[in-house]
From Swiss-Prot:
SUPFAM superfamilies: FKBP-like, GreA transcript cleavage protein, N-terminal domain
Signal peptide: none
Highest taxon above the source species: Bacteria
Gene: greA
A Pfam family of this chain: GreA_GreB
Name of the featured protein: Transcription elongation factor GreA
Record-linked InterPro entries: GreA/GreB_C_sf, TF_GreA/GreB_CS, Tscrpt_elong_fac_GreA, Tscrpt_elong_fac_GreA/B, Tscrpt_elong_fac_GreA/B_C, Tscrpt_elong_fac_GreA/B_fam, Tscrpt_elong_fac_GreA/B_N, Tscrpt_elong_fac_GreA/B_N_sf
Function: Necessary for efficient RNA polymerase transcription elongation past template-encoded arresting sites. The arresting sites in DNA have the property of trapping a certain fraction of elongating RNA polymerases that pass through, resulting in locked ternary complexes. Cleavage of the nascent transcript by cleavage factors such as GreA or GreB allows the resumption of elongation from the new 3'terminus. GreA releases sequences of 2 to 3 nucleotides.
Coiled-coil features, chain-numbered ranges: 49-75
Keywords in alphabetical order: Coiled coil, DNA-binding, Transcription, Transcription regulation
Gene Ontology biological process terms from the UniProt entry: DNA-templated transcription elongation; regulation of DNA-templated transcription elongation
Length: 160
């Protein structure tokens, strides 16, 4: 019997997924059911793009619900009181100097299920996140990227 993947998450990440799941189950499902009813009223299903679109939306939504339920069932929540303030780990905020762009950036290290790189939430499994985890202030890490190697110096660590 294979084991399910465990999802390391912060408390905030779990709450966000629970909120999305609740929305999909209570609001989105009703919207889709209504769209399907309306589309069925148009008659012939063989050329009914509204019906096809609603059924595709339904399939995507049901798939996402299953995915969220699985992630929440297998979530391992990081105890924020146990997040060290001197070593980078899931739940840490890390201020780094990015040598490629010569700028300071602050990342939140999160589990893969709650990663949002556009908002500086990077997964502990991503190349940069993985390189930072376990390091301390003053450490310099090198991360291999498609166009070469990026260097980051850890300037500060705090709890998220």
């Amino acid at each position: 019997m294979s084991q399910s993947k465990q999802y390391v998450m912060t408390y905030e990440g779990v709450k966000k997924l629970e909120s999305e799941l609740e929305y999909l189950k209570t609001v989105k499902r009703k919207e889709i059911t209504e769209k399907i009813k309306i589309a069925l009223g148009y008659g012939d299903l063989s050329e009914n793009s509204e019906y096809d679109e609603a059924k595709n939306d339904q399939a995507f939504t049901e798939g996402r619900i299953i995915q969220l339920e699985n992630m929440l069932k297998n979530a391992v929540v990081v105890d924020e009181s146990e997040i060290p303030s001197d070593i980078v780990s899931v739940g840490s905020k890390v201020k780094v100097k990015d040598y490629e762009f010569d700028e300071e950036v602050e990342y939140s290290i999160v589990g893969s299920a709650e990663a949002d790189p556009m908002n500086f939430k990077i997964s502990n499994e991503s190349p940069v996140g993985n390189a930072l985890v376990g390091k301390k202030v003053g450490d310099v890490v090198e991360v291999t990227v498609p166009d070469g190697v990026n260097k980051f110096e850890i300037l500060g660590i705090s709890r998220s």
